[in-house]
């Protein structure tokens, strides 16, 4: 796998980050909540609530879903404004396969690029070559094979997709359970059957063997999509997530500041029902949302970029 390269003015060689550094940045976010924000004010609310990072974007997934149209990378001025407003890491989204959007985001100095299915894909056949960048990438996955393909492309962090902008956590649970189940299956296979498993997963044998031996992905695994309550966040942590992305669920709710703080606390104390009961009180109305089963398969964001 590519290692660090120094800038070279005579050859114009690309500057890339080491695997250790990129994955290490995600390790520092483990156990935390990353929140979607569309304004500097929202970013400050997220930081005050205890978010470990924010995701800067012009429209939260619920609005993207409701308004339709083509969704693209956010305006650099908007991203700059959020970066200046907070001291925690700032992430931003690029379209699947849009390597120039990723180049722009890297030049802005964001801490992470999310090659995101929430935006309209720029390339339905190819993802960004993430090894070519200094900035680390996070990518979504609905199953283990998808996760391994993104890691092979250079992703330094994976999030189970769920179905963004719905407030319905059912797909998040399905995807997380599925990934964990597939990992346990690899652990149970004899060594000689891992070759067939690698073919089925469309992933390199060496990576499949590593997961069979360690029982986990080589990168941090967060969860996303439909998380709207403290209980949702705690459930996903108990299912094996190492952290939580929350999008529309906070700033589409009745009391964003309190809900944000409650979800952070629920993520930290996910195995303590008494704390969960306490932080779930008096939060006001959660986002109304939409049931995933009411969305046609062809319109589901999680189906993009598989």
Swiss-Prot record:
Q: Does the keyword Lyase apply?
A: yes
The UniProt entry, under InterPro entries, shows:
Aldolase_TIM, PdxS/SNZ, PdxS/SNZ_N, RibuloseP-bd_barrel
Q: Do you know which SUPFAM superfamilies this protein is assigned to?
A: Ribulose-phoshate binding barrel
Question: Top enzyme class of this protein?
Answer: lyase
* PROSITE patterns per the UniProt record, alphabetical: PDXS_SNZ_1, PDXS_SNZ_2
State its Enzyme Commission number(s): 4.3.3.6
Pfam family for this entry, one: SOR_SNZ
User: Binding residues for D-glyceraldehyde 3-phosphate, per the UniProt record?
Assistant: 177
Q: From the record, give the transmembrane residue ranges.
A: none
Where do the annotations place D-ribose 5-phosphate binding? Answer: 36, 165, 226, 247-248
Keywords for this protein: Lyase, Pyridoxal phosphate, Schiff base
Could you name the active-site residues?
93 (schiff-base intermediate with d-ribose 5-phosphate)
* GO molecular function terms attached to this record: pyridoxal 5'-phosphate synthase (glutamine hydrolysing) activity
Q: In which pathway does it act?
A: Cofactor biosynthesis; pyridoxal 5'-phosphate biosynthesis
Q: Which reaction(s) does the protein catalyse, per the Swiss-Prot or TrEMBL entry?
A: aldehydo-D-ribose 5-phosphate + D-glyceraldehyde 3-phosphate + L-glutamine = pyridoxal 5'-phosphate + L-glutamate + phosphate + 3 H2O + H(+)
For this chain, the family text in UniProt reads: Belongs to the PdxS/SNZ family.
Q: How does it assemble?
A: In the presence of PdxT, forms a dodecamer of heterodimers.
| PANTHER family, per database record | PYRIDOXAL 5'-PHOSPHATE SYNTHASE SUBUNIT SNZ1-RELATED (PTHR31829:SF0)
Any idea what this protein is called? Pyridoxal 5'-phosphate synthase subunit PdxS
- Its source organism is Salinispora arenicola (strain CNS-205)
* Name of the gene this protein is made from: pdxS
